[in-house]
């Protein structure tokens, strides 16, 4: 929202903004039409006319996610509104035409996330590697290689013959005898790599991991094949030495020139386990790596309604449309006041009622930063924010940061390079969130710098400082910096002077990477479970009297809470399915707003947990196109496999209907069409029975922004 609108908001009713919106729409100025419609909704959030004009304006601007959101909000107000129903149908047609023009219906490609995953060595791995090496040398007495020697050709031939005998014994199932024969062969020819590899395999089968690994370590590095390096990775992982396991898998991957997908996959499985293991220790889940990337699996059966796990954000920021609702800028706690909740009528309450509210309303401990641009629920949050990131982007310490908070206050509007006011920040979440990511990195790098008594962070310091953001994938290759030039330059200026002579250079590559890292992983959430109203009701418990009864009647309306976007490390590993089996809800984690991942359908041990990134009530073709556009994958879930795209093509066999005919739909769900009764029966058995009339999850999906992405924005997920 522009400054001009902010100045007058509150002095006009919703109808004033609505009239302005309609006027701008009629003139073709859809940006201003959308801006005024949003302003009307801020004043009167159940104004259905404002929802409609906002949806229309967003559609004209090709902001399809926003358009869909406003129409859905309108249907919440009036589920039978014919105008919205018709315009939603039109929106679906526009969406499909738009995606078709972009080539979105191109052939679906096979996808394997391992191609986009880094095997970079982590900064802290050097120390861990040395620690594991000491364990290998002292506990397992491993020798790195055999001493140089010359083997008698006769002995070498003798060893080969013994090895052939060992193979025959293996076929007979005599593993122990086969191991003995391998040992005899190695006594004759200690350099026989085949014998060492075979004995290692046999010892692993017997559970003798240490002996197996000793044979592999004895093989000179230059003689180790891809299979040997890969086998060593398996053994080291079994011994609980993940950094060495990664080292061996990395060698296998490099030696195979990335052709051995199994080695690359096993590397990522080890990495996922060591990164996420500590986070899942108290939950009935584990994080694994599949061809679709990091995934979460149940370790025991879970019933509907159970909480699979809780998560708290690494970094957060408000959604811009909630920027004026009071909340802690660090933890997202509601800072709702009596005046905000009860509105103008609060001043009309009689003295006893106001006195009771004042007495029982939770104590306000909120504090503001001296810059007056951030507010916190208490001094603890203020101190945490200061130590973690805020001192880098506080306008009182960094003069360039004023522009950042102005951009937030104006809901993404600012001056472009030509001095014209327009929307220069398109995403729904605040640009402050993006700035906090860099500020967190800078603060940690400076802390490490001071710890080592240096005046500048080293390369290692910067690498370690990025650890907290390591768990979040990045995908998207379009140049966002060129699409948001004003914000890109703003961030460069802000971090050109981070105090103490330290600066952080934000290149286009860095800007794009962090933008996508945020945009692809954000989840919306709020403090809806813990507001001052909840505190008031708790404090009123046991308080009797007429005034209390009156107050209780006045507190039946749900309080307005600010919605935030947060990056949650465990949650970020959840994959999507349109027939999701978990849903994301607001929760309290360690006393602060966070998210709960609640079971939506019964799970068995070993089942993968799936959330939904979008509104799954959309038609199949639109769902899949939207997911491809936003996340660069074609959904292959059961709902997408066994729902159809329309009456012109058989959902089961793909046969097209004749030009003047249409196929019959499923009589129950009406979302699948069949050319014959036989096809319908086949589809039912294959899987349609599982999704026919399957309940949709109506919980808020991921906070995604698709306006700056296109179908060529990424070739898959990449770990950053």
Where are these regions (language model features)?
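Short alpha-helical interaction motifs and adjacent low-complexity tails used for partner binding
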Residues: 1-49, 53-720
């Amino acid at each position: 929202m522009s400054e001009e609108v902010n100045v007058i908001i509150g002095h006009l009713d919703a109808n004033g903004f609505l009239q302005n919106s309609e006027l701008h729409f009629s003139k073709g100025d859809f940006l201003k039409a959308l801006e005024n419609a949003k302003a009307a909704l801020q004043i009167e959030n159940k104004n259905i006319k404002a929802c409609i004009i906002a949806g229309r304006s967003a559609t004209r601007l090709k902001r399809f996610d926003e358009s869909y959101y406003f129409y859905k909000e309108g249907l919440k107000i009036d589920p039978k509104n014919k105008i919205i129903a018709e315009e939603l149908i039109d929106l679906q047609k526009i969406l499909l035409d738009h995606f078709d023009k972009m080539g979105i219906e191109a052939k679906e490609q096979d996808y394997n996330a391992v191609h986009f995953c880094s095997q970079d060595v982590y900064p802290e791995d050097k120390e861990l590697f040395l620690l594991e090496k000491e364990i290998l040398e002292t506990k397992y007495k491993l020798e790195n290689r055999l001493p140089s020697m010359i083997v008698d050709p006769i002995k070498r031939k003798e060893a080969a013959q013994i090895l052939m005998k060992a193979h025959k014994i293996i076929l007979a199932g005599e593993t122990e005898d086969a191991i003995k024969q391998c040992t005899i062969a190695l006594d004759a020819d200690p350099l026989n790599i085949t014998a060492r590899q075979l004995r290692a395999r046999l010892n692993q089968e017997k559970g003798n991991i240490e002996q197996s690994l000793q044979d592999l370590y004895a093989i000179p590095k230059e003689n180790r094949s891809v299979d040997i390096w890969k086998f060593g990775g398996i053994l080291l992982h079994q011994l609980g030495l993940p950094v060495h396991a990664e080292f061996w898998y990395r060698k296998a991957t490099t030696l195979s020139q990335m052709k051995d997908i199994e080695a690359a996959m096993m590397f990522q499985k080890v990495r996922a386990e060591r990164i996420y293991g500590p986070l899942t220790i108290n939950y009935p889940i584990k994080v694994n790596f599949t061809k679709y990337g990091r995934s979460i699996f149940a370790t025991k059966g879970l019933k509907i309604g159970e909480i699979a796990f809780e998560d708290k954000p690494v970094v957060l920021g408000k959604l811009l449309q909630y920027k004026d609702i009071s909340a802690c800028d660090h933890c997202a706690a509601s800072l709702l006041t009596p005046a905000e909740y009860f509105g103008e009528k609060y001043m009309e309450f009689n003295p006893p009622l106001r006195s009771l509210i004042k007495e029982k309303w939770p104590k306000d401990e909120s504090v503001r930063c001296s810059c007056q641009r951030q507010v916190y629920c208490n001094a603890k949050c203020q101190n945490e924010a200061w130590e973690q990131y805020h001192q880098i982007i506080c306008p009182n310490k960094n003069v360039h940061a004023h522009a950042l908070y102005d951009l937030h206050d104006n809901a993404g509007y600012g001056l472009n390079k030509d001095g014209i006011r327009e929307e220069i920040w398109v995403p729904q979440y605040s640009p402050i969130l993006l700035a906090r990511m860099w500020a967190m990195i800078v603060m940690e790098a400076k802390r490490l710098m001071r710890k080592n008594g240096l005046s500048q962070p080293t390369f290692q310091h910067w690498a370690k400082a990025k650890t907290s953001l390591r768990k979040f994938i990045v995908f998207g290759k379009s140049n966002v910096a060129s699409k948001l030039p004003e914000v890109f330059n703003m961030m460069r200026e802000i971090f050109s002077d981070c105090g103490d002579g330290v600066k952080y250079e934000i290149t286009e590559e860095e800007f794009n990477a962090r933008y996508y890292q945020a945009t692809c992983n954000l989840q919306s959430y709020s403090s809806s479970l813990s507001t001052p109203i909840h505190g008031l009701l708790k404090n009123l418990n046991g308080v009797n009297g007429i005034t209390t009864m009156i107050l209780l009647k006045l507190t039946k309306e749900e309080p307005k809470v600010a919605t935030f976007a947060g990056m949650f490390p465990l949650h970020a590993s959840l994959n999507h399915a349109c027939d999701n089996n978990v849903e994301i809800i607001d929760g309290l984690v360690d006393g602060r707003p966070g998210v709960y991942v609640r079971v939506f359908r019964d799970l068995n041990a070993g089942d993968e947990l799936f959330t939904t990134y979008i509104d799954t009530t959309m038609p199949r073709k639109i769902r899949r196109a939207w997911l491809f556009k936003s996340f660069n994958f074609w959904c292959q879930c059961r709902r997408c496999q066994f729902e159809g795209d329309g009456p012109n093509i058989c959902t089961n066999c793909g046969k097209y209907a004749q030009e003047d005919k249409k196929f019959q739909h499923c009589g129950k769900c009406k979302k699948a069409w069949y050319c014959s009764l036989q096809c319908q029966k086949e589809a039912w058995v294959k899987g349609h029975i599982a999704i026919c009339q399957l309940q949709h999850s109506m919980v808020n999906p991921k906070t995604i922004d698709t306006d700056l992405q296109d179908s060529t924005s990424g070739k898959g997920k990449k770990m950053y």
